[in-house]
Swiss-Prot record:
PROSITE patterns: RIBOSOMAL_S4E, S4
Domain S4 RNA-binding, chain residue ranges per copy: 42-104
GO cellular component: cytosolic small ribosomal subunit
Protein encoded by which gene: RPS4Y2
Presence of the UniProt keyword Transport in the record: no
Ribosomal protein is among the record's keywords: yes
Family the entry assigns: Belongs to the eukaryotic ribosomal protein eS4 family.
Keywords: Ribonucleoprotein, Ribosomal protein, RNA-binding, rRNA-binding
Gene Ontology MF terms: RNA binding; rRNA binding; structural constituent of ribosome
Membrane-spanning ranges: none
Gene3D superfamilies on file: 2.30.30.30, 2.40.50.740, RNA-binding S4 domain
Alphabetized InterPro entries for the sequence: KOW (IPR005824), Rib_uL2_dom2 (IPR014722), Ribosomal_eS4 (IPR000876), Ribosomal_eS4_C (IPR032277), Ribosomal_eS4_central_region (IPR013845), Ribosomal_eS4_central_sf (IPR038237), Ribosomal_eS4_KOW (IPR041982), Ribosomal_eS4_N (IPR013843)
Official protein name in the record: Small ribosomal subunit protein eS4, Y isoform 2
GO process annotations (BP): translation
């Protein structure tokens, strides 16, 4: 019987969205414990070495991190296996680049560059609202932040905008029909659309119906929905494709049209 924490991760057992090839080694970097789950995060070493190609080996990534060049959500991180997750802001001060981790429609984290202004805030989904000691209300977000004395109008499943400099809530978006959202889990991972309907199922999961910009409708559980803006206007910039999933035939037609226009 195994005792103690697991310290290794086989490459074939690593999450698919890390996009690691099977034949370049036996092991994959196991993410440290942190604000995001193992299957829903991207370790810094994978982001720097495999995505940005700023390093060739793990040792080079360690040397970059130990010089305090990398910040996640405004805080310096030196752990190369630190788990960055959905909507986190990764800043590299040496190059002046800022990235936000968001899903593309293939279900992988896109390398999405953002402006300096956008890197000053992030959105967080409200997971739980409780009352702590001495009657102090607490709000817990999807990235394990605990914020005291939130606005009484904020409810579970709403989205709060957090200033990364102060860590305080600057604004919030209600979970309501007509607001734009992104799917963060399940078969429709990475799709963006407007909430059209919410089916309530007491004792089970509520089902949310969403319509994307092309007019295609789909449904998913309420726990998979992350509201990202009021009305049709998202509060964060979206990666290429704007969260619209194309069918195989539509992708083929798009490729052919691009080839003909370039040729």
């Amino acid at each position: 019987m195994a005792r103690g924490p697991k310290k290794h991760l086989k490459r074939v057992a690593a999450p698919k969205h890390w996009m690691l090839d099977k034949l370049t080694g036996v092991f994959a970097p196991r993410p440290s414990t942190g604000p995001h789950k193992l299957r829903e995060c991207l370790p810094l070493i994978v982001f720097l070495r495999n995505r940005l190609k700023y390093a060739l080996t793990g040792d080079e990534v360690k040397k970059i991190c130990m010089q305090h060049f990398l910040k996640i959500d405004g805080k310096v991180r030196v752990d190369i296996t630190y788990p960055a997750g959905f909507i986190d802001v990764i800043s590299i001060e040496k190059t002046g680049e800022h990235f936000r981790l968001v899903y593309n429609t293939k279900g992988c984290f896109a390398v999405h560059r953002i402006t300096v202004e956008e890197a000053k805030y992030k959105l967080c989904k409200v997971r739980k609202i409780t009352v702590g000691t001495k009657g102090i209300p607490h709000l817990v977000t999807h990235d394990a932040r605990t914020i005291r004395y939130p606005d009484p109008l904020i409810k579970v499943n709403d989205t709060v905008q957090i200033d990364l400099g102060t860590g305080k809530i600057t604004s919030f978006i209600k979970f309501d029909t007509g607001n734009v959202c992104m799917v963060i889990a399940g078969a429709n991972l990475g799709r963006v659309g407007v909430i059209t309907n919410r089916e309530r199922h007491p004792g089970s999961c509520d089902v949310v119906h969403v319509k994307d910009a092309n007019g295609n409708s789909f449904a998913t559980r309420i726990s998979n929905i992350f509201v990202i803006g009021n009305g049709n206007k998202p509060w964060i910039s979206l990666p290429r494709g704007k969260g619209i999933r194309l069918t195989i035939a539509e992708e083929r037609d798009k490729r052919l049209a691009a080839k003909q226009s370039s040729g």
